[in-house]
Amino acid sequence: MKHLIGLQGMAAESIKEILDRAALHKHLFINQENAIRPSLKGKRIALAFFENSTRTRFSFEIAARNLGAQTLNFSASSSSLSKGESMIDTIRNLEAMRVDAFIIRHPSSGSAEMIGKSTDKHVINAGDGSREHPTQALLDIFTLREYFGSLEGIKVMILGDILHSRVARSNIFGLTTLGAEVAVCGPATLLPVDTSRLGIRIFSQLDEALGWADAAIVLRLQLERATGGYLPSLQDYSFTFGLTDERLEKIKKHLPVLHPGPINREIEISGNVADRIQPPGFSQSMLLEQVTNGVAVRTAVLELLISPQPDT
């Protein structure tokens, strides 16, 4: 595999290979065994982030350094892009500095694919517009596989702004490929029109969706949706679709809850639900476990793509 642009069309075997290697890296990361695993020693990796990021950027940087690679941090605001240089010219200049791989985050859908077609170096999509965010989905899938043991037949409900979410799209592609059942729930104005061709269920009532689900992935609500005509108000969204203890108590079953972060407390998820990492209660927050798993998954992706023969 030359690039990781998205999970759409990726074979189940390729996804499982990443997850299996991530399990190895998580063990090493947690136990601090051989903290530096130099399979990418001498490689240069450019983190070209045209959008702000905390978890994704830092976890990729930790992953690269744990593999012995050098990282170059690129900021659009302080680069020649601010002087009018095109994105492709910027990439070509970094190529001339013997960069081996690009990790790209960009607000435009399709940008990572365009760069992948313009360079012979490795390209990893760290989120492009509303299209895909493959490594976020991979770490979500890894978290769920750790929790359930297998994803075959597991019912996963994705809650929130599906229409604009690259995280939702990548999760739908990856989860269904591995045999999970997927449903989405949210306001009609924030659901895409093409859900039927994706082979997923649609719920308009959160209580019904929670009763169906084995696990929930809650998406961050972009606050501008309330002023963009998509929602009556944030308060209305929170009342109808916010994940709270009161809602979870109605279903009387234990539910792992995931969220890609950052969270809007008391809007899409209550503080109690976000912070509960163990019983008692009817939910278990996986949010911090996802962050740890993000380092492991991104380490696996870098190693499998860039190292010709990863150490075993």
Curated annotation (Swiss-Prot):
GO molecular function: amino acid binding; aspartate carbamoyltransferase activity
Positions bound to carbamoyl phosphate: 55-56, 105, 133, 136, 261-262
Binding positions for L-aspartate per the UniProt entry: 83, 166, 220
Any Gene Ontology CC annotation: cytosol
One Pfam family in the UniProt entry: OTCace
Origin superkingdom: Bacteria
Protein name: Aspartate carbamoyltransferase catalytic subunit
Gene that this sequence comes from: pyrB
